[in-house]
Amino acid sequence: MRLVQLSRHSIAFPSPEGALREPNGLLALGGDLSPARLLMAYQHGIFPWFSPGDPILWWSPDPRAVLWPEKFHLSRSMKRFHNASPYRVTLNYAFDRVIDGCANHRDEGTWITRGIEEAYRRLHELGHAHSIEVWRDRELVGGMYGVSQGALFCGESMFSRQENASKTALLVFCAEFTRHGGKLIDCQVLNSHTASLGAIEIPRRDYLDHLAALRQQPLASRFWVPRTLFLPRK
């Protein structure tokens, strides 16, 4: 296994199976963040992740963190909060503000560089990247964004400025995504936050098999039309 240097003249990627074991999943470096290359990456279970000043690094970790949306873990406290929630949730209303929120809301620094922001804004303009917004009155208090691959959604980042705002974004999106045929959410690497919401780890090979099948199952185009999302109170 060796780290592959990508060419700017080809958007091809090496097989994810050739990724390094340490650091886990590092596959390649270089290339660019053009829409064509980013889409090629997501189609093959690969994503960019690098710090400011570093070369572009491409990853496909093993195991892979995923969330089956119908298995979102709704804790008792979160259920009580949601039933009296002061929030309103929307889809694709404010992509630029959501990615800004994700970039600026990490105390330890951010991997969302200016180049990353510009690249994903372009994907959004092309209809491939999407945002979920959480509002309190007219204030944006949380949200998340990611890239659609048919019935699979690749979550990229989320942020929260008020209590349970990012959890609310994921909860409401999971319900809406499931109702319209969505099957799986890619969480990339498991952390305590996503694990508490029901994310699990599966072998990379299994993730790639799910991706190959689900990306061939497009949701209705109207699913991504900007609108308010609702989740019935229980």
From Swiss-Prot:
GO biological process: protein catabolic process
GO cellular component, one term: cytoplasm
Compartments, as annotated in UniProt: Cytoplasm
PANTHER family, A to Z: LEUCYL/PHENYLALANYL-TRNA--PROTEIN TRANSFERASE (PTHR30098), LEUCYL_PHENYLALANYL-TRNA--PROTEIN TRANSFERASE (PTHR30098:SF2)
Record has Methyltransferase as a keyword: no
Lineage: Bacteria, Pseudomonadati, Pseudomonadota, Gammaproteobacteria, Enterobacterales
Protein's UniProt name: Leucyl/phenylalanyl-tRNA--protein transferase
EC number: 2.3.2.6
TM annotation in the entry: none
Statement: the UniProt record of this protein carries the keyword Isomerase: no
Keywords: Acyltransferase, Cytoplasm, Transferase
Family that this chain belongs to: Belongs to the L/F-transferase family.
Catalytic activity: N-terminal L-lysyl-[protein] + L-leucyl-tRNA(Leu) = N-terminal L-leucyl-L-lysyl-[protein] + tRNA(Leu) + H(+); N-terminal L-arginyl-[protein] + L-leucyl-tRNA(Leu) = N-terminal L-leucyl-L-arginyl-[protein] + tRNA(Leu) + H(+); L-phenylalanyl-tRNA(Phe) + an N-terminal L-alpha-aminoacyl-[protein] = an N-terminal L-phenylalanyl-L-alpha-aminoacyl-[protein] + tRNA(Phe)
Main subcellular location: cytoplasm
Role noted for this protein: Functions in the N-end rule pathway of protein degradation where it conjugates Leu, Phe and, less efficiently, Met from aminoacyl-tRNAs to the N-termini of proteins containing an N-terminal arginine or lysine.
Enzyme class: transferase
InterPro entries documented for this protein: Acyl_CoA_acyltransferase, Leu/Phe-tRNA_Trfase, Leu/Phe-tRNA_Trfase_C, Leu/Phe-tRNA_Trfase_N
Domain of life per record: Bacteria
GO molecular function: leucyl-tRNA--protein transferase activity
